[in-house]
Amino acid sequence: MYAIIKTGGKQYKVEAGQAIYVEKLTAEAGEKVTFDQVILVGGETTKVGTPNIDGVTVDGTVEKQGREKKVVTFKYKPKKHSHQKKGHRQPYTKVMIDAINA
């Protein structure tokens, strides 16, 4: 059985026992999280929500919080002796999917 959930403005296809990386959640490592915005549940039969399916949740456990690799941007203006270098590291949360409650 699989489900498509929505969190952090993105959609993820998940199955029980799968680890996913999502946008940063406020939960700490070891805490349980519940995703209630389930868009689709598939398996023997497929159920599609409009926009969400009522009464269906996906449970998971936060494994760790982290930050992705640095992305460097560089702006340069020729003949002006002007340049700007910036770096950004996006925070993420690693979640282990425990169960799909359909």
UniProtKB/Swiss-Prot annotation:
Instruction: Determine if Transferase is one of this entry's keywords.
Output: no
BP terms from Gene Ontology = translation
Q: Its GO CC terms?
A: cytoplasm; ribonucleoprotein complex; ribosome
**Annotated keywords:** Ribonucleoprotein, Ribosomal protein, RNA-binding, rRNA-binding
Q: Which PANTHER family match?
A: 50S RIBOSOMAL PROTEIN L21 (PTHR21349), LARGE RIBOSOMAL SUBUNIT PROTEIN BL21M (PTHR21349:SF0)
What protein does this entry describe? Large ribosomal subunit protein bL21
**Family of this protein:** Belongs to the bacterial ribosomal protein bL21 family.
What quaternary arrangement does the UniProt entry report? Part of the 50S ribosomal subunit. Contacts protein L20.
The record's SUPFAM superfamilies line, in alphabetical order, gives: L21p-like
Domain of life per record: Bacteria
Matches recorded under HAMAP family: Ribosomal_bL21
A UniProt-annotated Pfam family: Ribosomal_L21p
Any one GO MF term held by the record is:
structural constituent of ribosome
Species lineage: Bacteria, Bacillati, Bacillota, Bacilli, Lactobacillales
Cell cycle as UniProt keyword: no
> Which purpose does this protein serve, as stated in its record?
This protein binds to 23S rRNA in the presence of protein L20.
